């Protein structure tokens, strides 16, 4: 997404109150070479700038520029509790190496402390085998303690419903996730039919993006989309339980209170990072 287009959308949302802008959606924010400029836009409108990332490129001057721009929260996705498991789940020839990611985290933690930044450096981990939770959890906790970061450790998820995760599948009562009713909007860079700024109900549609477009910010303002026909149709589907295809297999609909296995900071299962609302308030 171009910087001027991004600022247009941020300014539009800011009219209605803006607490947090997550700069990644379901993509990789560090693909943008001028990412610090996007962070500055978020700060200009009084919101917090959050990024969830694989962390491959978050090093050196690029990392320092992001922190200095006012980044509030950066989360490294770190799947695999040791080098062997990390290589299985996260390996990438460009930067997905266990030792490299550890160095990137350590470097960022050190710079945040050195610069006096309030940026929170965090990691995100998944239990890859529900039959081996205790052992994996202890290995993750040791890693987190060594790195000196905040963390959250979750059971395996299948939010888009696009994969068969076997024995790791969640189990529980199915009801609306609450997201279509919540004050959270997801704006993508691209769109349909050469439009841009596609609006999705959440970032978990993963791979089913074309099915889940509720409007385009290049064509309408965010209020018209949020209160528009497509959004209201989705809300009614969530009220009745007649979920659309891009929702009905998503395991975010499943009530599983044990899905958040461990956290060492204020991370509530039903509250998205930095937001004030509770999704439970929108699930009844």
Role assignments for model-derived ranges:
Residues 198-199, 204-284:
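Flexible mid-to-C-terminal extensions adjoining Fe-S/redox cofactors in radical SAM and related proteins
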Residues 1-146, 150-154:
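Radical SAM/AdoMet-radical enzyme domain recognition
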Residues 167-184, 188-189:
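Structured beta-strand/loop patches that form or line metal/cofactor-binding pockets in enzymes
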């Amino acid at each position: 997404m171009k910087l001027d287009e991004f600022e247009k959308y941020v300014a539009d949302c800011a009219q209605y109150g803006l607490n947090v802008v997550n700069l990644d959606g379901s993509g990789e924010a560090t693909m943008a070479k001028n990412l610090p400029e996007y962070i500055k836009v978020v700060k200009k409108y009084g919101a917090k700038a959050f990024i969830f990332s694989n962390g491959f490129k978050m090093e050196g001057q690029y990392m320092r520029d992001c922190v200095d721009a006012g980044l509030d929260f950066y989360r490294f996705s770190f799947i695999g509790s040791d080098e062997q498991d990390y290589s299985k789940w996260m390996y990438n020839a460009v930067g997905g190496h266990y030792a490299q990611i550890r160095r990137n985290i350590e470097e960022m933690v050190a710079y945040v402390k050195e610069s006096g930044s309030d940026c929170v450096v965090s990691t995100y981990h998944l239990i890859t085998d529900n039959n081996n939770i205790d052992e994996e959890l202890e290995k993750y906790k040791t890693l987190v303690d060594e790195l000196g970061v905040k963390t959250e450790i979750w059971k395996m998820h299948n939010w888009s419903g696009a994969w068969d995760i076997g024995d790791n599948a969640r189990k529980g009562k199915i009801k609306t996730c609450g997201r279509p009713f919540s004050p959270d909007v997801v704006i993508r860079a691209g769109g349909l039919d050469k439009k841009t700024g596609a609006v999705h109900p959440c970032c978990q549609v993963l791979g089913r993006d074309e099915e889940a477009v509720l409007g385009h910010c290049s064509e309408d303002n965010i209020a018209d989309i949020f209160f528009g026909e497509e959004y209201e149709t989705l809300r009614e589907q969530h009220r009745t339980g007649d979920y659309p295809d891009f929702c009905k297999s998503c395991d975010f609909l499943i009530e599983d209170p044990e899905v958040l296995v461990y956290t060492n900071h204020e991370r509530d299962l039903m509250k998205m990072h930095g937001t004030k609302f509770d999704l439970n308030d929108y699930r009844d």
